[in-house]
From Swiss-Prot:
Its EC number is 1.21.98.4. [4Fe-4S] cluster binds at C28, C32, C35. Pfam families: Radical_SAM, SPASM. This is PqqA peptide cyclase. GO terms for molecular function: 4 iron, 4 sulfur cluster binding; cyclase activity; iron ion binding; oxidoreductase activity; S-adenosyl-L-methionine binding. Binds 1 [4Fe-4S] cluster. The cluster is coordinated with 3 cysteines and an exchangeable S-adenosyl-L-methionine. One of its GO terms (biological process) is pyrroloquinoline quinone biosynthetic process. It comes from Methylorubrum populi (strain ATCC BAA-705 / NCIMB 13946 / BJ001).
Length: 384
């Protein structure tokens, strides 16, 4: 009798995706210096049309996707955002609108509600209007955001406030908590900047010091206790001050896929920064084939690609080696241990880099923009 074929390791099994990040457009009225979009932004002329997005959603539902995050850029800049939202509802997909709340967002909100929108995630750059508008690069944005948030709660939609934290607004963490309560939000994300995309370019302008980070964590933990049952507060700490890396996107190719405005499918926001990866487009391949067969998703899925110390670490199926894009940017090799991990030989250097930049006077922001040739000030610096 032939011996039974051994079951594959759980790390090698390709799970069904849970979430789809639908980057409907890169157009956005805000110009945030920490934007996670790539430096080379897709133009409107390259965006997928309505029928392509409806097909993507249908295929996503067939794959087992549960949540669709309608994002951008500013997703309400799309004239077909209501139709796309209605398709999510028709397919039973939980829809989360990730929005700046400015421009045409308020004018479309009631129609989105009628179409079956499930949840709204509103970005707030600061509590003080002048500071918020300096960070976002758009005057008179704050009153629009407050009007938008008020209408969200009037409609009975669950509201999450998203506050990306950096040295320019870290002093406002208590104010973000108070604002979330005032607006009737169900959830607040206190998300320290993750240094990819435009945030990597602006790292020296955005990096807070360790004492500020520790104090912000203390404030959040106290507020969690005080507001238990009223407000859920999610906290994302900066990798540069962490002990262990986070499981980027829940693990490469394990939970989430990101479809760009032109239909390129990525395992994470910044995956395009890794040279040599072959990305497939929804215009050429079915979404299911991309998830299971595309070279980019296979490249760092599971644990087989890992080097030491990740390969033998008991955390390898918890954080999946951390962020591949950060490993590349800071060590020169995407397969290296993420230096956010205390087990990385470069961890101390990463901490020192953060300490040095936080101690310097911050340079001016390089604002996110389409069609501008951005010179990355870090491009001439050697990795750690």
């Amino acid at each position: 009798m032939n011996a039974p074929t051994p079951a594959p390791s759980p790390a090698d099994v390709i799970p069904a995706p849970v979430g789809l990040l639908a980057e409907l457009t890169h157009r956005c009225p805000l110009r945030c210096p920490y934007c996670s979009n790539p430096l080379e932004l897709d133009r409107r002329s390259a965006e997928l049309d309505t029928q392509a997005w409806l097909r993507v959603l249908t295929e996503a539902a067939g794959l087992g996707v549960l949540h669709v995050h309608l994002s951008g850029g500013e997703p309400t800049a799309r004239p077909d955002i209501v139709e796309i939202t209605a398709k999510c509802a028709e397919l039973g997909l939980y829809s989360n609108l990730i929005t700046s709340g400015v421009g045409g967002a308020l004018a479309k909100l009631d129609a989105l509600y009628d179409a079956g929108l499930d949840h709204v995630q509103l970005s707030v750059q600061g509590v003080d209007a002048a500071n918020a508008e300096k960070i976002g690069g758009l005057k008179n944005a704050q009153p629009q955001k407050m009007q938008f948030a008020a209408r969200v709660t009037e409609l009975g939609l669950p509201l999450t406030l998203n506050s990306v934290i950096h040295r320019g607004n870290i002093h406002e963490v208590p104010g973000f908590i108070d604002l979330a309560v005032k607006l009737g939000a169900k959830r607040l994300e206190v998300a320290h900047t993750q240094y990819y995309g435009w945030a990597y370019v602006n790292r020296a302008a955005l990096m807070p010091d360790k004492a500020q980070v520790d104090e912000s964590i203390r404030i959040v933990e106290a507020a969690r206790e005080r507001l238990k049952g009223q407000l859920v507060i999610d906290l994302v700490v900066p990798d540069y001050y962490a002990k262990y890396p986070k499981a980027c996107a829940g693990g490469w190719g394990r939970k989430l896929m990101n479809v760009t405005p032109q239909g390129k499918v990525l395992p994470c926001h910044a995956a395009e920064t890794i040279p040599g990866l072959e990305f497939w487009y929804v215009t050429d391949h079915a979404l299911g084939d991309i998830w299971t067969k595309s070279p980019a998703f296979a490249a760092y899925r599971g644990t087989g690609w890992m080097k030491e110390p990740c390969r033998s670490c008991d955390r390898r199926e918890k954080d999946w080696g951390g962020c591949r894009c950060q490993a590349l940017a800071l060590t020169g090799d995407a397969a290296n241990t993420d230096p956010a991990c205390s087990l990385s030989p470069l961890h101390a250097k990463m901490r020192d880099l953060a300490k040095e930049e936080a101690a310097e006077n911050p340079p001016d922001y390089i604002y996110r923009s389409i069609g501008t040739n951005v010179q990355n000030p870090l491009s001439e610096k050697a990795p750690l």
